[in-house]
Amino acid sequence: MSFFDAVLGQHQVKEQISTLIQDSALPHSLLLYGESGLESVSMAIAIGSTLVGRQIFSPDEGRTYLSHIEQRRIESGESESTVKDKGLPVYIDQGDAFWIRPMKTQLSVEQWYTILDTYINVSSDTPRVVIVEGFQTANAVLANAMLKTIEEPPRNMSFIIVTTNIDTVLPTIVSRCMLVSIQPVSEPELVKALTEEGYTGDIHRAVRLARGNPTLARQWAETGTIESLEKAMNILEQLVERSHFFTTISLSLEGLSKNVVIDILRWLRILARDMLALRYGAPLEKMILSDYRFSMQAIVERWSSKALQRVIPVTLEAEQALRLNVRTGLVIDGVILALREAVKEDI
């Protein structure tokens, strides 16, 4: 049994990484990148487990391990709210596996110095691995602090960096890492996985709408909807209302994390694409989100082709602003106003 068995899809990556490890030729620094929900952390844990020679953390993206740590913190006297709101600076598994995750919303340079000064700044006779999750939240200070260690790593130390946006990673970091692209899972494999996990109902529909994203497919299979997609559809509906559109949309998006907002922006682009297809009479099978055709048909006449075409640049610019750590609320406000301006002449 391979540690990679817990990772859906990614067969070419698994084969390549396994061969490199067997040949002792794997670079000491890897950069895994792919959209949120593709379970890149599971791949990072599988690679780390293969390097160390045992299961590190837990194969379910570390969820079981993290739950165990949270329970231990509560039992030791920390309040449940503190434990839920703030993770540990570094998670350590038996002294040879280290995991840094964003605390609240961002990675901090203090987390790196903690692990560097206390744990890894020495050579070892046995393999050790550091997983850095959520690197899209890292600022330049942290990236530069990591760069020196990546350039001159301690002996037997491997670094696995995980990001949902490679475009925000410093070129100096990218150039020193082996790049590993995490891709959507094929529909047959994802259907098979959800069936084996015990999901019922219209799994094929869930997988089709999720477009190869395991996290979104499970969400649809459990609830019958994808929350970020529903919110995107609601935005398009509210933008063509004559009054209260700004307040209604703002309240519906209040308090959402950066990653969720990015998902909503992506769904807006897909919905706009399908609405353009509707306007030009494209057949049903050409639509990506055909299950939403009735909702789209109800408003498509109130969105001109020009306004729908504006959705793509507006949301891409907003996504880039979020990557650069512009306040989420300001980005949301900008999107609402820009898209309202695009449709205003049609209302």
Language model region names:
Residues 132:
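An amphipathic, basic-hydrophobic helix/alpha-beta surface used to engage anionic
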Residues 92:
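Extended basic-aromatic, gly/pro-enriched interface segments that bind polyanionic ligands
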Residues 33-35, 99-104:
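A short hydrophobic beta-strand->loop->alpha-helix junction that borders the nucleotide-binding pocket
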Residues 99, 106, 137, 152, ...:
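Residues immediately C-terminal
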Residues 124-129, 154-160:
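Loop/turn-to-beta-strand initiation segments
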